Each structure stands twice: as C-alpha cells, then as structure tokens.
Amino acid sequence: MSKKLLIKTWGCQMNEYDSSKMADLLNAANGYELTEIPEEADVLLLNTCSIREKAQEKVFHQLGRWKTLKDKKPGVVIGVGGCVATQEGDSIRDRAPYVDVIFGPQTLHRLPEMIKQSQTSDAPVMDISFPEIEKFDRLPEPRAEGPTAFVSIMEGCSKYCTYCVVPYTRGEEVSRPMDDVLFEIAQLAEQGVREVNLLGQNVNAYRGATHDGGICSFAELLRLVATIDGIDRIRFTTSHPLEFTDDIIAVYEDTPELVSFLHLPVQSGSDRILTMMKRPHTAIEYKSIIRKLRKARPDIQISSDFIVGFPGETDKDFQDTMKLIRDVDFDMSFSFIFSPRPGTPAADYPCDLSEEVKKERLYELQQQINSQAMRYSRLMLGTEQRILVEGPSKKDLMELRGRTENNRVVNFEGSPDLIGQFVDVKIVDVFPNSLRGELLRTEQEMNLRIATSPSEMKAKTRREDELGVATFTP
C-alpha cells in the first residue's frame, strides 16, 4: 500500500509551484501519492504565506487540527514550509513541538532526508537557510498536469519595499541559469503543455547565466521560450515597474506568444505613499510604461496590486490612487488593506486611520475595478477570441472551459478531444465571472508558429559528464 501525502498551500503562485515540486520530489524519492483526506495521510505538509495579517496564528490554528490527527496516529509526520516557516521557525518549534520538519522555500529539496531524519529524532528537524538556488539542481523532472504550467525562473527580491517580507523570507534575487529554464520548459512541452507562466518575485530582474559565461536578460529569455514548438502562450508574474525596461516592451511588438495581459503592481497612485513604501517610481513614470506598452500592443490589458490604508494615507493620497486606476483603466486587481508584517520598516509606522475608513476605501477601489472589468468583458461580446481549452466546464461537465489571453474563462460546447488545444470562439454572452462562446475553428485550421522542437531545445542544453565537464551543443 502506497504512502500518502497531503500538502496544504497558502499564498502566491510561487508557493503553488513549490508545492507541486514537493509532491514530485517525495513521489520520486519515497513513492508518496497525494491525497486530500488528512486522515489518510502519512505526511502532512503546510506551505505557508506571511503576506497577510495574522498569518502566524492561522498556521498555529491549522497545526492544532493536525495535532489531533497525530495524537490518534503517532507515526504521522507534520511539516511546515514556506515564508512563515522562515520567519517564525523558532516560534513554531517552541509553540508546536509536535511538528517534525520545518523548512524554508529554498530548502524544500531536502524534504526526503529531513523527513527520514525526523523519524529517528525527538526534536524537530529544521533548515530555513538560503543556499542560493541549489534547490533547482535537486528536484525531479517536471510533470505536466494539464496544458498549462508554472516555471520558476528566479527566487527572492532585492527591492526591500518597506511593507514586504519577501527579501527576509525568500532571500535576495537569484536567477536560474538560462539553459535550466529552457530545458524544463522543453520537457513540459513534450508532455503537452501549451502555456507557461514564468514565475518570480520580480521576473523582469532576471539575469540568467548562459553556457558561455554570458548573461541572458528577461527579454532574451522570453524570445527563446517563444521559439519552443508547442509553447504558444507565455505569461509571467510578478513584475516591478523599476525594471520594466524598453527591451521587455519591445518583445510585445514581435512575439505573439506573449499574451496581451500584464500584471504590473503599482501599490498606490500617490507619489508620497510610494516614497514611504520605498517604491522608486512615480505614478507618472508608471503611466509612461503603460503608454509604451499600449503602443507596442494596443489591445494589452493591465492588472495591478493595491495596498489601501498604508500608514499616513490621507484622503488625497487615496484619491490619487483612484485617479491612477481610472487613467490606466485597469482590468483587474489584487487589493488589500495594509497589514503590518513583523520585521519590516512599515510595521513601525504610526497609523491613525480607522478600520471603517480603510474598509470604505477598499470597497470603493474594488467597485471601480469591477466596473472597469465588466466593461471590458462587455466589449468582448460578439468578438472572436482564441482560448486554450483547459478541461470540462465547472458549470456543466458536458461542456468545455477555456481561457482567453486576458484571463477570462469561456464556457462552450465542444468535444473532449479539444482539451489541451487552442480553439477560436465567438463570444455570445457575458457574465460577471465568465463568458460564453461558440466554437468557430480548431487548431488544425490555425497557422501556429513552429520554430524549435522540444527535443532540439533539450539537445542544445548544457550537459555535464560524470567528471563534471560541461558541454553545450549550439
């Protein structure tokens, strides 16, 4: 009987990616199979996020529930990973001594040996260090789970925004070598992946080493990924306005695989608040980037992050944010009330705003974004859209579900063999959270670009023999 693994994931797409790698790693090393039933699990892993308020208490609340399972089944291994583990490792060890393994985002590759070690140790096994980007060298080959996939291209952030814990929990920016990224994507393409989402806390700061000792920029990486046959759609998240340079914008002019949708967090429309956040750009500079993007790709749609109620935010500061939202005409946003994160400079800033005012501002902001998003959706009525078919519709299992470039879900009637392919549909109805389409043509009738086969890309990748001597086929 196979051993069972349950992974509970909170937080960003990087955490989702890390959790998938944990599952692959433990399956390859020890034969663990995933389960969603806690009572079945031999190993319970909690992959945590420390961005939001009360993240630590949320962790201890979940661990308390798992302790009940461990009391009934003493052999169960409980592990805590992610950013809360990095920040609060000692606290977890003290407050929850029944936790067996504590690991950080950069040490998840050590999970098999840490779990094994914990089974012969009375004390929790903990490693929350930052060993550069070693974890990517220790992970098994990627396994595709559908036509879309996340691929991490870098880790950490070196910007040190005053409200953010990422530099303290994931370390500073470290880029994966270019060959490693391309090899992973080629492996996924061979398994039927059609869309990749390149991940990092600040992907446009990517500077990956090349086989000949050079450096590959993010713009160059995007163009290389686009040449891999089968990869017909590229997304990336998240970006920083400071390094959204003209060479990246130029990729939107000549690389159709790069989607007409961009998540570019601005956080506030007030220059005063941006300075307090240590965001080294102004609202006007942000709008200048958007103007250049829309010149390169007129149909591009923009989403952002916003923090409402930052310490010292006045009504004028908030109205400056609302003006930026209207001027840029954002399509969607992730918006939150400021919550102080322990150890960050902003946690010590005085704040005299009432919770009521913060909630009112958040509601006003979200209503504005929602109205803009609905207007964009209505403008799509009657248009032709190319969608990647992801699987059965969640509303009707007899129908299919796909996604447009601008992240709209489209439900339509079609045969199951279309799953994993691109189709063109006509949008015939608009709903708050989805669109309805009618099938116009399938992939066989399209002229999708073919450049480099996945096997060719893999053959070009840097290799080391048993002596560690590297070779590269140009």
Curated annotation (Swiss-Prot):
One of its GO terms (cellular component) is cytosol. Residues 143-375 form the Radical SAM core domain. PROSITE patterns: MTTASE_N, MTTASE_RADICAL, RADICAL_SAM, TRAM. GO terms for biological process: tRNA methylthiolation. It comes from Vibrio cholerae serotype O1 (strain ATCC 39315 / El Tor Inaba N16961). The keyword Iron applies. It is found in: Cytoplasm. One of its GO terms (molecular function) is 4 iron, 4 sulfur cluster binding. This is tRNA-2-methylthio-N(6)-dimethylallyladenosine synthase. Its main location: cytoplasm. Residues 378-441 form the TRAM domain. Residues 455-474 are annotated as: Disordered. It catalyses: N(6)-dimethylallyladenosine(37) in tRNA + (sulfur carrier)-SH + AH2 + 2 S-adenosyl-L-methionine = 2-methylsulfanyl-N(6)-dimethylallyladenosine(37) in tRNA + (sulfur carrier)-H + 5'-deoxyadenosine + L-methionine + A + S-adenosyl-L-homocysteine + 2 H(+). [4Fe-4S] cluster 1 binds at C12, C49, C83. Residues 457-466 have a biased composition (Basic and acidic residues). CDD domains: Radical_SAM. Belongs to the methylthiotransferase family. MiaB subfamily. Binds 2 [4Fe-4S] clusters. One cluster is coordinated with 3 cysteines and an exchangeable S-adenosyl-L-methionine. Catalyzes the methylthiolation of N6-(dimethylallyl)adenosine (i(6)A), leading to the formation of 2-methylthio-N6-(dimethylallyl)adenosine (ms(2)i(6)A) at position 37 in tRNAs that read codons beginning with uridine. Keywords: 4Fe-4S, Cytoplasm, Iron, Iron-sulfur, Metal-binding, S-adenosyl-L-methionine, Transferase, tRNA processing. Residues 3-120 form the MTTase N-terminal domain. Its EC number is 2.8.4.3. The keyword Secreted does not apply.
